[in-house]
């Protein structure tokens, strides 16, 4: 089976790497020439780290390397069985990609979007094959996270959903099936918890590390909400929150000012080296300096207000 991945960012690279390791002929396309040139190096480096940790054999990594192709033009990889879109979280951009794919790909191709919050049904409307469009929401980092949400749009056929489930399982992932609603299941729950944790930091209730420890030790969460937000990407969290606030008409998804400030300053979490934490590779290395500064301001304001009461 041939798989095309559109988008060579963090998620696209992770998805392509997983597909090639699982035995699929995998092609990656990105409209940015710099991203095209860099993607193979990123993916092969991730495989090398997995080999060092004993999670992948050198032989499997070498075979995957030969299955991985990089396309300079989208039409070069159009003859695929699955086309998985992993471009930035913007509805118009995703619809444009799917419309172009619809013109280039054969009728058998199933289109999947890695969106974490946008409507699969709306995305499918950009194509003439609405029954063959499905959501495949992978989690970052793809090589580590075992979950994929399989999202069924209003017109997604049972056959398309079944084939998507089979693909997910063949990658060694666990699938959960959800209907096409704003934020699906994981983003809606995860963003709710993450935003409230950010508000607590912002208002001086507790430091980021203490909030995370409270959820990890008190509720058995593998990772606290702020560490998770840094891993997902604070820019992604902000985009999802704005989408959910609009789609569900609910202020509980209103992004806190600390989130907007960090994103505006480029401090988007692990991929930027700093967010609510400072990061060294994949591991947190202390609190983020800017988020701590913003939190101190919040505590000072809260203390002053309490004094005036």
Predicted feature residues:
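Rossmann-fold dinucleotide-binding core
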Residues: 110-180, 184-188
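Rossmann-like dinucleotide-binding cores of NAD(P)H-dependent redox enzymes
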Residues: 28-61, 150-161, 175, 182-190
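Amphipathic alpha-helical segments at domain termini/boundaries
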Residues: 3, 21-23, 62-82, 163-172, ...
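NAD(P)+-binding Rossmann beta1-loop-alpha1 motif at the extreme N-terminus of oxidoreductases
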Residues: 1-49, 53, 104
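NAD(P)-dependent Rossmann-like dehydrogenase/reductase catalytic/cofactor-binding core
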Residues: 22, 169-180, 202-203, 208-309
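Rossmann-like NAD(P)-binding element
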Residues: 35-38, 49-111, 118
